[in-house]
Amino acid sequence: AGGIADGRGMAAAFMLGAEGIQMGTRFVASKESIVHENYKNQIIKAKDIDSVVTGMSTGHPVRSLRNQMTREYLKLEKENADFMELEKLTLGSLRKAVQDGDTVNGTLMAGQIAGLIRREQTCREIIEETVQQAQECIAAQGQHK
């Protein structure tokens, strides 16, 4: 799910037959989002290679921004740590990021598109900009037929 950061992604999804899109990370970094400003700032500063998937060994993969916690988690996974050891590491880590703003030990859930987000915007601005850009992309496709 997700993987959409802007109108280009929305247009591509629609041109492939989708009837809607899901945007998560983009709205986590919005002005209305209740996550801690440190979390939002990490998303805004992220580059395209700054996310990583943890939890593959447990069957519950989660994409997050790289930090000390994800490095430790991946190390433990590589060492075949059991579920309880991994669970112990992550217990409360989302709260640490969302409420406390702990960007070192918290889980900073974010999609691969984090690297495309450059500023904090209102939800209204995100939606209007995304729809306008999608309409422009779709209209431009019609001119290339």
PLM region spans:
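Glycine- and other small-residue-rich loops at beta-strand/loop junctions that grip anionic moieties
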Residues: 1-3
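Conserved active-site-proximal phosphate/metal-binding subdomains
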Residues: 5-145
